[in-house]
Amino acid sequence: MGIKNLNTLIESNSLNGINKRHLSSFSGKILAIDTNVYLYKYLYGKSNHIDGMFFMINKFKKFNITPIFILDGKPPDEKTDTIKNRRLIKDRLEEKLSLLKIEIKALETDMEIQEIQKEIDVIEKKIIYVNRNVIDKTKTLFDLMGVVYIEADCEAEHYCSKLCNLDIVDGVVSEDMDTIACGSKLVIRNFTNRDDNVESYYLQDILYDLNLTNKSFIDLCILLGNDYNHR
């Protein structure tokens, strides 16, 4: 549910809650992976999602980390309006994309073609969607590489947090700050295949620095605004 400005607030007010750590420090740990976040990241990038996931899995193996990949399930009813708005925006962008692809065929100069192509490239990234084909290919890769994955009955970040709260996993790997709001005691962010260093968010240290209880922290996240509560 993307908490607005939460990361900025934590960075500004919690000296102990965020630490830069090398992945080797998580050797022997079990981590839940908010998979769809990284599928979108790899689809947006220059490499395809299979390449991205392949290198991600190998990096975990390199540092003796056991990943459990969690795939998105059905979003909650409270998110219906947000999903409808996103779909409307996507439909408008697809319509604009179709018109631009027609327009570019009629252009003559390289400069004009390059300008329109840039606009096309931007829109194509904005309408990227993790569809069933992407999920099926990713699951096939997981099977081939012998890693565990779960298709959640809810949004992946919530399921990851549940596993963390139940001490089934030691932490959550995600770029979404809502995993912290959901109570994950450890959230690992800024994971890339190019760098072995990550940022680790420790919920108890964050609460201590902010002088908040867990309930007060959740109330703060609601006030900041999210996919259910627009501010």
Name these PLM-found stretches.
Residues 1-100:
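Non-catalytic, usually N-terminal nucleic-acid engagement modules in DNA/RNA processing proteins
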Residues 84-231:
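Extended two-metal-dependent nuclease catalytic cores across DNA- and RNA-processing enzymes
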